[in-house]
Amino acid sequence: MSELFWFEKYRPRSFDEVVDLEEVKSRLREFVKSGNMPHLLFYGPPGTGKTTMALVLARELYGEYWRENTLELNASDERGINVIRERVKEFARTAPVGKAPFKLVILDEADNMTSDAQQALRRIMEIYAQNTRFILLANYISGIIEPIQSRVVMIRFNPLPKEAVISRLRYIAENEGVKISDDALETIYEFTQGDMRKAINALQIAAATEKEITEDVVARALGMVSPRLLRETLQEALKGNFSKAMTQIYGFVVDGGVGELEIIRQIHREVLRLDVPEYVKPELAYIIAEAHYATLRGARGLTQIFGALAKIRRLLKQAV
């Protein structure tokens, strides 16, 4: 297996290689076709393709000259807006290479910039608008000031669907000569919830421990409980077999080394999938949230887990 990070090794390099995101690809293809585009803001959760799509757009716009015409910056890495200003100024003062009418600046983690820095960024975008376009990347649109939002076309990136993530993981596993079970693929998706970067990294971590990846291999590699085992344990608790459930959970923590907060997070996911009336689910979520908060505050995690399971069983009995 290659030592290169698989997420980088298998990063798409064209629109056709990008899984899902059909609406986004359609809009960006129109910009490429017209040879012009506005400033853009890509926003959405981590691992949903924002950086990848920005780089694909650069390749599609500039072809072999995409590196010469593209400047990548990270707002959290740079030493301040003055550094960004100087780098953009130096980059924008020369003409684009090839036939492109403008150069491209990709600014990641733009929502981590202060309001003052974003105001300065807005002025930079206006000064160099004649021959430079900006793509701002952000996890949270609420972190971007309104004066910038009004000057860009905003494109939302949603968590990737399970089918798209699992298909990509299976493709990578085949290319790397790794055997992986369907249950293992499902477990990786459960752990990563539509974050493609996190999913591919999880696959690589699991593959580094075993050539044949099962659900249990994934769980051990990622420091989580096998979803199958957790569901079985939850069912024991809901049936009133607390002694058995407590023994199993104790084993997950002490013998398996799984963190109590991780177990609480997994219980939260499983509980909300129970076949119960919808009006009950907010109360279930609240019970789990209380246990999570108390554990974060220093309470003993196992005690919080056992207490939450008892409350959940009592609530579900009342709802029947």
Swiss-Prot record:
GO terms for cellular component: DNA replication factor C complex. This is Replication factor C small subunit 2. The keyword Transferase does not apply. Keywords: ATP-binding, DNA replication, Nucleotide-binding. One of its GO terms (biological process) is DNA repair. Belongs to the activator 1 small subunits family. RfcS subfamily. GO terms for molecular function: ATP binding; ATP hydrolysis activity; DNA binding; DNA clamp loader activity. The gene is rfcS2. Heteromultimer composed of small subunits (RfcS) and large subunits (RfcL). ATP binds at G44, P45, P46, G47, T48, G49, K50, T51. It comes from the Archaea. Part of the RFC clamp loader complex which loads the PCNA sliding clamp onto DNA. It comes from Pyrobaculum islandicum (strain DSM 4184 / JCM 9189 / GEO3).
